[in-house]
């Protein structure tokens, strides 16, 4: 198997293992690690090395001299050129093994847990066509695509096997004139199948567009958003509950796995009718909506204005719920409740040190930490255990087949 070679420096090496981020890695003769996208451990390869960094090298696969027996044919012709997928060359059961090992390694190396007891990864029911939301970049000619692995250019695509059918029926028909200020298009399919498009641009007002598809259309501008056609929001149904989700609000892209994760949290968080719950980074209320009818009081904290508005709609029926708007690290210590259960679902950057300090000093006896980044999760678990919490369980969920991403739920308690 050969790939385009544009560099002057070529090295032959054996790939040793996977790293978090999807790359395989090997070592040069001097021991310096080389990170190689789309390689597999055990393969003997030739890689180009355009430039050496002080502590590592980034390599590009030129030729596979000895392929791994685990290597399979990728489904998508854009694989290795488009940066959206990382593991299409690996059968799904092996993808799950890699993700389990990555979570375990991060907990051991960064979290300093000697023997992390990581449960088997909960697999996705669908390996393909599972994403209800997609972000398409536009090429200079206005065609949809994704950034390449360098993030420097947009690769125009003719097919994609990650979106749900509703999204896949729309994106190939996107025809946006180049140079009118639109740089990205978000497509989201609600549970009812209705598709909402969010056009992201740098202009204050939307350009003139002709809509010839039965979809809802929003312009997400620099200072203001505009509803141009159709519905103001999508409806996403999780475990029989409908959620209002606006175009700028985050929601889990794999609904069946979101349902599994919610069920797991509810079954293991220890919430009772006497519980007081604090839901930090609560988003549109995915966990709060199911906890609110079970507990005495619940408070959510969220920075996103769009998500806060959706949270208010989704939790409107409950008198025991309050919402605090702002950065968690700025306002957590001033919240006027004394939680015994805290739900954490932060962005990839994880917890600010001030949040960790607040939790260590709080009345919380149980934490549920939902993470999309094993490295920052491991770092935060180390800090939280130093603050008096102990880890009860580590449960990964695969919400993102064909990619290196993995969601992990960690249950923690404090005496």
Give each language-model segment a name.
Residues 1-78:
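Terminal RNA-binding accessory module
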Residues 2-12, 20, 24, 177, ...:
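Rossmann-like S-adenosyl-L-methionine
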Residues 24-29, 145-149, 198, 311:
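Short, acidic/hydrophobic/Gly-rich beta-strand patch recurrent on exposed beta strands
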Residues 29-30, 53, 138-143, 149-151, ...:
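Short acidic-glycine loop/turn motifs at beta-strand connectors
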Residues 62-74, 80-182:
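Extended interfacial segments that mediate partner engagement and assembly in macromolecular machines
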Residues 119-126, 187-188, 223-225, 396-399:
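Short, solvent-exposed loop/turn elements at beta->coil junctions and helix N-caps
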Residues 187-202:
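Carbohydrate-binding surface patches
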